[in-house]
Amino acid sequence: MRMRVFASTVLIAIAAAAQEQPPAESSFPQPNAAGANNQAFSDPSALFGGGSGATIGLAVQNIQSEGSYAATVVNADFTLGPVGLGVAVPLNLMVWNNDQCCAGGYTRESKTYLGILRKRDWDEPQDFSKFVRYLRYGNKRDPLYVLAGQLWGSSIGHGTLVSRYSNTLSLDHPKAGLALDVNTDFVGVETLTDWVGNPTLMAGRAYLRPFGDMPILRGWAIGVSGAMDRTAPYNVTGPLAQDPQGNPIVPNTRPVYAMGVDTEFELLRNALISLIPYTDFNRIAGAGNGIHVGVLTDLRLPVPLIEMSVQTKFEYRMMQPGYIPEYFDQLYDLGRVQYAVPQGSGTAYVAKYDAAVAARNGDTSFSQRGYYGELALNFGGFIQVGGLYQDRDGDPTGASLGVYASVPKFETIKLSGYYLRKNMSGFSDAFRLDERSLLAASMAYKVWGPVYFRADFRREWVLAPGETQIRAVDSFTAGMATYIPF
């Protein structure tokens, strides 16, 4: 009995010491895995983000197989305290038409209005949402956080169900989403909607900190998560049909539900390190269950002359065969319709929910194991690099790889980019560009005064006129622009 009392006293003393000198940037422990790294795979073209200013210029944009356009580079960011607003005027004026593309849409007239303005940029009401890139209040983990518009890397909870979801990957169909979070010492809520006009994906998490006002135990939280695709495709077979705007016509849809419970405890929190182990139990209805056990680390290194930080996430997974971790991921808008699965010596594409149900095959045991690792390095904000890797035993296409880098603070040159490869068979398959690869990069080189040479590369998805499969298209933009801070 005395030994138990002594051991308890020592543990409490250690925990109390670990909680001293909390980091100044937030009064709340980080409730989720991606809280600090959501922007790791964000818009690389936002090279001058973080303050108020405008970029004005003209460039030439080449869209793979389609043609070349004179493109406006008109973006402005306004920041006032916690409020941020980003606007744009994105116009593509055809310069050269590739008359070999596409089946059902070869001519300049079929691709443009008046032979000039790209038609698929402005043939749906939601296209006008491109004028407002984002409207933001606060930052992730603030007491109140609101983000409306483009979602580049939005997660819910520890990111085990909804991880870095993006609504920006379609070339022709932009969406204005909404993320809204409320965080207090005792309770909090995270929400996510992919498109405020006609939402498909809706997700949320509510968490409770029973001892939110106690110095030692305040780091313990329990949460409940849920996500739903209201119109998930299923029984998708054969070629895809499309409407006049290029949206796939899916005859069979149904709601798909996913839910989970989680708990975490912040073991360490001081000026140098934050350490949070967590456990999630998730279920995808009709497909399978999964258990995630992980740890989040945020380490601040006292390096002379520069503030250096290291963030890591390591996770071990136990899964039923039909369970797909991070089901609503960065490529979900593509995968819900066209998801890669192995077939013989090749690859077939089915709806993601069909793939999950087929993989279950009546097996309810947690027979499959997997792991996830993520590392991010920040050298005083001047250089930011990182990567992630995950794999799954028993799944020949269960691996994923991601890398990113950003050099945002140098005046002469600014660089940003990322690469993500999903559903690959291993490292030998890691750098193949196809419908499972996501690549984006941007550069700004200072020529003179406020004048910069700009170059942007984007890999997006399109269901081209007359085609029956969604495919990746690459667009490259290069031109001159002026950045005016205000």
Language-model region placement:
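Hydrophobic h-region of N-terminal signal peptides that target proteins for export
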Residues: 10-18
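Extended, charged low-complexity segments
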Residues: 414, 440, 444-486
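Signature for the C-terminal beta-barrel architecture of outer-membrane proteins
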Residues: 49-53, 67, 98-100, 142-145, ...
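Short, solvent-exposed loop/edge-beta patches enriched in aromatic
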Residues: 76-85, 139-143, 410, 447-449
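N-terminal periplasmic/intermembrane-space "pro-region" immediately following the signal or transit peptide
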Residues: 18-65, 73-84, 486
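Surface-exposed loop and membrane-interface regions of Gram-negative outer-membrane beta-barrel proteins
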Residues: 85-134, 161
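Sec-dependent signal peptide recognition
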Residues: 2-9
